[in-house]
Amino acid sequence: MTKCYQTTLEFSSVKRRRVEADFSGGEITSDAGALLLSQADKRLGLCRDVARALGDQRLRARCEYSVEELIKQRVYGLALGYEDLNDHLQLRHDLAIQTAVSRDKPLSSAATLSRFESRADREAALAIHQVLFDQFIAAHEQAPRRLLLDFDATDTPLHGEQEGRFFHGYYDRYCYLPLYVFCGRHLLVSYLRQSN
């Protein structure tokens, strides 16, 4: 029979909040994977670098959440399978996701995230891609002798009257057809396209 000697697993604390995983009850979440995402993101610095690249033109005195916190909340939510902004009506109160974003209070609302995403433009997309390029370069001690770029398109089904939707005969549905460019395991470009 297997014997377990470790009853808890400790994570980095957030302000006054001690964070540990155990199985004795208390505050329960099905999204504890956000804590692991947060640890990986700390090592990579991806959300931090994207926030710096985007900058913040808002009046800081009127803002409760930093750009980095908004990005982390949205990215971690997407990684956990919560694509819709309305999911954040509940997620903002989840202790694991709050902890992953390094807050000990409720996170931003769906409306705040929506306003944040609505400000995104071509310049923001280029700035984010520059961060991806920089991460790719930083992952190599020296320049690779050869680069093999993998261009992939995949369908993203649409279920409403979204702007720019077209019917794609091959996929037999309305969809977008985003383009992804990888070099090995590194994503270099993610470009949302219409499927026409």
Segments and roles (model prediction):
Residues M1-N196:
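Dynamic "connector" segments at or just before major functional cores
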